[in-house]
Regions:
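Active-site-adjacent alpha-helix immediately C-terminal to a catalytic or transition-state-stabilizing loop
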Residues: 64, 72, 155-176
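Short glycine/proline- and acidic residue-enriched helix-loop micro-motifs
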Residues: 113-149
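Phosphate-coordination/substrate-recognition cap region in phosphate-metabolizing enzymes
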Residues: 3, 44-126
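Histidine-centered catalytic micro-motifs
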Residues: 10-16, 176
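Loop-to-helix element that buttresses phosphate recognition and phosphoryl-transfer chemistry
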Residues: 15-70, 145-154
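Glycine-rich, flexible loop/turn motifs
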Residues: 20-23, 28, 86, 94, ...
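Short coil/turn segments at beta-strand junctions that form active-site/ligand-binding loops
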Residues: 6, 51-53, 166-172
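Extreme N-terminal starter segment of soluble prokaryotic enzymes
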Residues: 2-9
């Protein structure tokens, strides 16, 4: 297998209603606020002059809207518009039982048994991976993704990019 160098631009969506309300959202499909739409347009303006060979995003509306706005601006600047691949492998972490719950309540439930008061305390004491593992432990149904489950899914998403036969060495891709 030939090794290729691809340039990947990672873009996060702007503010959603769940963000505004301090609610956990991973797989929940909370729409972008007006501020979030403005953030998408700012990202679009900054990326408009980059020629993208491919574009990928999660299958959530917030990611798709952000991606479409960036690709619209890119196309308006004279670039060929790549097809947008929306796939669940690019979703954010799944919070299981805690999806849509107030963040302070969820992170207290996850960190409390480990002597951590909140998300930042968990990260400081145990590292980022522990945030996923502790939340899965605290989920009464254990549906929330563990760190291992999360990375296994995301790696499958990166495999979709790597397996794209149209990409060549040096191409630039966009991931929302």
């Amino acid at each position: 297998m030939e090794t290729m160098l691809l340039h990947l631009h990672l873009v996060r969506h702007g503010q959603t209603f769940f963000n505004r309300y301090n609610r956990l959202q991973g797989w929940s499909n909370s729409p972008l606020t007006d501020a979030g739409l403005a953030d998408a347009d700012k990202a679009a303006a900054k990326l408009r002059d980059i020629e993208f060979a491919a574009a990928y995003c999660s299958d959530t509306t917030r990611a798709q809207v952000t991606a479409q706005r960036i690709l619209d601006a890119n196309e308006a600047a004279g670039h060929v518009r790549p097809s947008l691949v929306s796939d669940m492998h690019f979703r954010e972490q799944f919070y299981g039982y805690f999806e849509g719950q107030d963040m302070s309540v969820a992170w207290t439930a996850a960190g409390g048994p480990h002597g951590a008061k909140n998300y930042n305390d968990i990260v400081r004491k145990y590292g980022l991976a522990a945030t996923r593992d502790f939340l899965k432990e605290a989920d009464p149904f254990h549906d929330a993704e563990s760190d291992n489950e999360y990375w296994h899914r995301v790696e499958d998403g990166f495999a979709l990019i790597a397996d794209n036969p149209r990409l060549k060495d040096g191409d630039v891709e966009l991931l929302y």
